[in-house]
Amino acid sequence: MLLSIITVAFRNLEGIVKTHASLAHLAQVEDISFEWIVVDGGSNDGTREYLENLNGIFNLRFVSEPDNGIYDAMNKGIAMAQGKFALFLNSGDIFHQNAANFVRKLKMQKDNVMITGDALLDFGDGHKIKRSAKPGWYIYHSLPASHQAIFFPVSGLKKWRYDLEYKVSSDYALAAKMYKAGYAFKKLNGLVSEFSMGGVSTTNNMELCADAKKVQRQILHVPGFWAELSWHLRQRTTSKTKALYNKV
């Protein structure tokens, strides 16, 4: 089974180097096969040259050209993917050191489910919090797992892809569309990835809440009262996360 690892980057050579290094332990496992797809937004910081010098290690394929933002870049990665499942590890995100044990289990899974695992959220200064994957019904409030810990069936990604209408929650919208189309969530035990906090979902919580509410109403068709309750719960959670990030 081939796993597609898709990395989106823009002017973050340090992050690309970090993500690349985390793939090494997977490559050492004989029964794991993967490709690394990097979509760079035309950076001028040496990212392209670094990738060229890797000479295709880890079945690397990449493009370096302007795009219309992170979700447009992710769609480019989907178009290039040839695996059964795909995981999005953007520049600076890394596989957990024990992720090989999790990845091995994928070859026994059917490609009509979204596989979820746990992730470590890095707030800096050694402060990390584990986010455990939740049951599939949690999609009616939010993603059941961190985006960096969801293995999407590539066949499903090629049908739906990321909707650029959703500025900060297109990952939630995509998972919701696939869920409504019959792709269930299946939780497997184990840590998949680690990633640093401080992205759009951490710093722009008001836009995140509004975007997520639109997903709930337009895609998941949840009742208005539930969408309102979810909005308040999300706002409280994201505010706490933002405060913790700023404190650390």
Curated annotation (Swiss-Prot):
Gene Ontology biological process terms, A to Z: colanic acid biosynthetic process; lipopolysaccharide biosynthetic process; slime layer polysaccharide biosynthetic process
Pathway(s): Slime biogenesis; slime polysaccharide biosynthesis
Statement: the UniProt record of this protein carries the keyword Nucleus: no
MF-aspect GO terms: fucosyltransferase activity
Pfam families: Glycos_transf_2 (PF00535)
InterPro entries in alphabetical order: Colanic_acid_synth_WcaE, Glyco_trans_2-like, Nucleotide-diphossugar_trans
Gene3D superfamilies: Spore Coat Polysaccharide Biosynthesis Protein SpsA, Chain A (3.90.550.10)
Signal peptide span: none
Keyword tags: Lipopolysaccharide biosynthesis, Transferase
PANTHER family in the record: COLANIC ACID BIOSYNTHESIS GLYCOSYL TRANSFERASE WCAE-RELATED, GLYCOSYLTRANSFERASE
UniProt name for this protein: Putative colanic acid biosynthesis glycosyl transferase WcaE
Organism: Escherichia coli (strain K12)
Gene that specifies this protein: wcaE
